Amino acid sequence: MLDLIGDTPLLEIQRVSEGLHSKVKIYAKLEGFNPGGSVKDRPAWQMIQDGLKSGKLRRGKTILDSTSGNTGIALAMIGSVLGYPVELVMPANVSIERKQIIQAYGAKITYSDPLEGSDGAIRQCRKILEESPDKFFKPDQYFNPMNPLAHYENTGPEIYRQTDGKITHFLAGIGTGGTIMGVGRYLKEVDAKIQVIAVEPDDALHGLEGLKHMASSIVPGIYHEEELDGKIPVSTEDAYSMVYRLSQEEGVLVGQSSGAALFAALNLARKIRSGTIVTIFPDFGDKYLSTNLWVGWRDRMTVGNIKFSI
């Protein structure tokens, strides 16, 4: 099962990108094709392998980490394959689908204050570890260098190969920062002219689960903003609108962070006359059908001639 992680397909965005200059192309890497359903399979497996090699993860230990969903799902899946118990701390308001998937893999969930978001989960996870340090192995996705290394060694080379080296711009949302840091470092090494641009919510209070508004958040230790060529802020409304367009015009059902990534990519694409833009779609949208992305928002959205209604 774990050998299936990586080598995800690259999709050219066509109908949604109509009207761009003919020499501008946008591609999205569909990370939902990983066995655990998201880009987080990559760093989760890299961190677990490192824990096993170092001896920090061994029989009798429980895997513990904070998550907004996808890393937790990845760790729960990996734990089930390897036979390790998994305990996760996540905000109480994450979607029911993510809770159910994690529990289906046999992992335990401890819920943190929903008003504190992912930062609250980080703090509560640290407290649990402090109370029982010998019980747990904590991958610590926000501070573990194995997180970006997974993308440096795998995701980055895949993207460069899939575009035949023609990529000119790379965009990714900021959650832990692992994807943008790891892919960005690899691409800059092979071609320093490639632009690496981060995507983040435009406000501290937002509905883009999995993404961090860095100015108001605990900054992950693996995130180094000075390595970026820029950042593009995206509103919740614009990201949601792009999700609807993708489902109706491209046949791709994705989550909020993917909508934000494509909105930012289109924003950039309209400003250039030639280039190959690649972004990441971290997962598919089946884990978000019970959230505000679809419930309620559908009443106010029209895509093409289709009016969404509950």
Language model segments and positions:
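PLP-dependent amino-acid enzyme catalytic core
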Residues: M1-I310
